[in-house]
A protein has these predicted regions:
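Conserved phosphate-binding/catalytic region of the ribokinase-like
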Residues: 56, 106-215
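Ribokinase/PfkB-type carbohydrate-kinase core domain
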Residues: 3-139, 202, 209-215
Length: 215
């Protein structure tokens, strides 16, 4: 549910409350190329096993990404010092990162995670995104702004999908960032989180027509 810049989520937990590592087919870790984990605070079983899951992925050469998303109870009890070294790309937004690290500014929050990350991409809404590499290199990229936003529901997830789609194809992190900015922008051209995405050709056509994007 979304109004202006406020939103509320209503979720039926279902299996998310009980699903854990024991429910995952071990073959996933030998067949997968990349594993993306999202909304970890809403998945208590997987959260408990998160480090073990990530170690299994790492042992099998599987790259990983994590978008914590919002903690509905706002406890933010994730052991990021031990989790982040096992994550290939950490993908929070600024608000979530400040909440996770219990810091008031984004610079302070980045300082907290810097010793532990491999790579991080921080989503900044209408300001774009900030890429931080393991060596400390930063790359700020402006957003592709939509002057006629329908809504922003799912824009962060859409950014993730674009970034990861390029990442698994071996693109540079900067190219992944650019593609993520594009898919996040395209998301805002239609209502809901997935309506704007029918097929790759249409997404790139809309991106070119609306934002001048050329791959």
């Amino acid at each position: 549910m979304s109004y202006d810049e406020d939103r509320a989520n209503l979720t039926y937990q279902g299996a998310m409350d009980v699903m854990s590592l024991k429910d995952i087919n071990p073959e996933v870790f030998t067949h997968a190329k990349h594993i993306h984990i999202s909304s970890i605070f809403m998945q208590s079983g997987l959260k408990k096993d998160l480090i073990e899951i990530l170690k299994l992925a790492q042992a099998n050469g599987v790259t990983t990404s994590l978008d914590t998303q919002w903690d509905p109870v706002e406890e933010w009890d994730l052991d990021y010092a031990n989790v982040l070294p096992l994550i290939t790309v950490f993908m929070p937004n600024e608000t979530e990162l400040k909440a996770l690290t219990h810091k008031d500014t984004i610079d302070e929050a980045i300082e907290c995670i810097a010793p532990y990350i491999n790579n991080a991409i921080i989503k900044q809404g209408s300001r774009g995104s900030l890429l931080i590499k393991k060596d400390g290199t930063r790359h700020q990229m402006a957003a592709m702004l939509n002057e006629n936003v329908v809504d922003c529901i799912g824009a962060g997830d859409s950014f993730n999908s674009g970034f990861i789609a390029q990442f698994v194809q071996g693109a540079t992190l900067e190219d992944c960032q650019r593609y993520g900015n594009m898919t996040g922008a395209v998301n805002t051209t239609a209502a809901g989180g997935t309506t704007a995405f029918t097929c790759l050709e249409d997404v790139e056509r809309v991106a070119k027509e609306r934002f001048g994007f050329v791959k």
